[in-house]
Structures are given as structure tokens and as C-alpha cells.
Amino acid sequence: MLSLQTLAKKVVACNYLSSDYDYTLQRFGLWWDLGPIHLCNNCKQIFSYKHLQCFSEDDLCLEAALVKAVKSDNLELIRLFVDWGANPEYGLIRVPAVHLKRLCTELGGLTPVTEPRLLEILKEVAKLKSCAGVLLGYDMFCHNPLLETVTRTTLDTVTYTCSNIPLTGDTAHLLLTKFWFALALRHNFTKAIHYFYKRHKNHLYWRVACSLYFNNIFDIHELCREKEICISPNLMMKFACLQKKNYAAIYYCYRLGASLDYGMNLSIYNNNTLNMFFCIDLGATDFDRAQHIAHKAYMYNLSNIFLVKQLFSRDVTLALDVTEPQEIYDRLKSYTSKNLKRAEEYLTAHPEIIVID
């Protein structure tokens, strides 16, 4: 049960007050980083008064706020955030000083933090889907001695499950850096992306690969505008074709000069027919090569369809001629493949060519 003082602080923090009350809020313990603390009663995010809406990139979940308070050795705020619902175990992950560890334990944190619980917290942080959550995860887990006992196989499995992207790295630190960077790129958390890239300039290739894999052309557009990319458009197309329905990324690579025939063939290799038909809709025409690849991949129905070359043609409505990311997303929002529809109609009308596995 919350004490009367803690409850009063929570009520005050959940309401906006004018700057006339700044001194009172400071004396009341609701002041942090040169500004008053505000707690959203609905989403439990903590943010400053400069934001009058939740879910900005500077918002902090209670756990992220707790870790930040532990780092700054702010005992009063540690107690306050735990009283408001933050899990005190999060304060123990970074192996804090003895007095901070003792406080977090007194507030309910269990020590020692077991390996299963450590990995469970890693997954919890990854699921926060916020800029602050990504930066929190990087801060908590990279260079963390608690992870030294975790096997590489276990860590690989956990990070792949959370990101759905194969990760590589010689060390656990490098693996986790790529992991949190990938999550920032997946959700286009620009503040986190810039934070990582400023510290890890050597990860440009990884940044491009992840952005294309996650269909994040906002980030690719920014890199192109700043002339940071020195990777061939066809190699970029390779990353874009790995994920299903990566239409915006495929289109952007095409606008940069990537071959649509290459994208079509890559999509067949990846058993990704929706991306393949998108490339055809954009203007891919090398159906002889596509038929050969489909046949070698035992995709006989697709191989037979490619024998009817006159079936396919470019979709003129996709002649977008735009490069602004938001406009590309908007134009493709209602996209459906005309060539896919023709192929389905042809198979329905000619059941004799269908090969049943």
C-alpha cells in the first residue's frame, strides 16, 4: 500500500501544473534533470513538461527511469519509482554500488539475479518497443558481467527470438550492440539510431542491412541524403528481398539503380512470391532466368507460369517517380499485385498445368 506522501506525489505528478509551481515541485521531490516529473496515469510513462503528449522519444517507462535514477545515485527517486510500480530488480542488473544494491534489495529486488531471470528481463526490455527501452537495454546489458556465465548459444537464441534477425559478433558485447541497434532500426527510433551510429560508425553495413530488412526506408533515405552509403544498389536489394512484403524497401533500391530482374530472382530463391510479383509489377522481364530458378527450386507451378511470358506486364500505376519515404509508404499502402491476380486466374483456367506435391 502506498504511503500518503507517495500517493500525494503520484496525484500531483499525474496533473499538469504551471511554472509557478516549479519551486514547490522541487521541494516536493518531483524534479529531475532541470524539469518537473510527470507521470501518465494511462501508459505509466514518465516525461517532462516540454512534452504534452505521451510516446515521444524522450519518454521513460518506470523501469528505465529507475535505472537512470540508480546511475545518478538518486536514492529519493529510486524509492519513488519503485513505489509507483517500477521493478526493483532492474536496478540490480547493472551491478550497482553496494549501497544502491542494498536499497534495491530492501525495496523488493531479489539477489543474486539468476540467469533465467536475467534473460527474462532482457526479453521484457526488448518488448517495450520504445526509444527509451532500446537505450535502456543497451545500457543494462552491454558490458554486463552478469552475462559472462550465459552461453553463447543461449544468448544467440534469445536475441534471435526477440529480433527475428540472425545476429553475428565475436563477443557478447558486439552481439548485443547489433541486437539493440537492430531493434532501433526496426521501429525507426531516430534518437536511438543516431546514438548507436555516433558510437559505432563501423556498423554502417549493419545499419543499412537492418533498415532494408525491416522495410525502414526513412533511415535509408537519411543515409542517402547525407551521402553515407557506399554499398551497391543490388546488394541493398538483396537485403530488401529477405523479408515478405518489403515493397517500400524494394522500390527504394530500384530507384537507386538496383536491377528488378535481380530482385525477382532473389525473391524466388527466398521463396518469397509476393516480393517476386512486386518486382514484376515494377517491370522485371527476365522470365527465362526466373523459370530456370523456380524449376531448380522445385517450384514447378511457378516454373510453368513463367513459360507463359505474355501473361505478365508492368503495372503502370506503380510508376511512382517519388523518393520521399512517407509518400512511398502512402502510395503502396493499398497495393495489390495485378500480375499475381493474372497468374491465379490462369492457373484456375488451366488446372492441367498444376503440379500437386
Swiss-Prot record:
Alphabetical UniProt keywords: Host cytoplasm, Host-virus interaction, Inhibition of host innate immune response by virus, Inhibition of host IRF3 by virus, Inhibition of host RLR pathway by virus, Viral immunoevasion
Cell compartments where the protein resides: Host cytoplasm
Pfam families (alphabetical): ASFV_360
Domain of life: Viruses
GO annotation terms (biological process): symbiont-mediated suppression of host cytoplasmic pattern recognition receptor signaling pathway via inhibition of IRF3 activity; taxis
One cellular component term from this protein's GO annotations in UniProt: host cell cytoplasm
Family: Belongs to the asfivirus MGF 360 family.
Protein's job: Plays a role in virus cell tropism, and may be required for efficient virus replication in macrophages. Also inhibits the host cGAS/STING-mediated type I interferon production by inducing host IRF3 degradation through the proteasome pathway.
Subunit-structure text: Interacts with host IRF3 and TRIM21; these interactions mediates degradation of IRF3 through TRIM21 and ubiquitin-meditated proteolysis.
Name of this protein: Protein MGF 360-14L
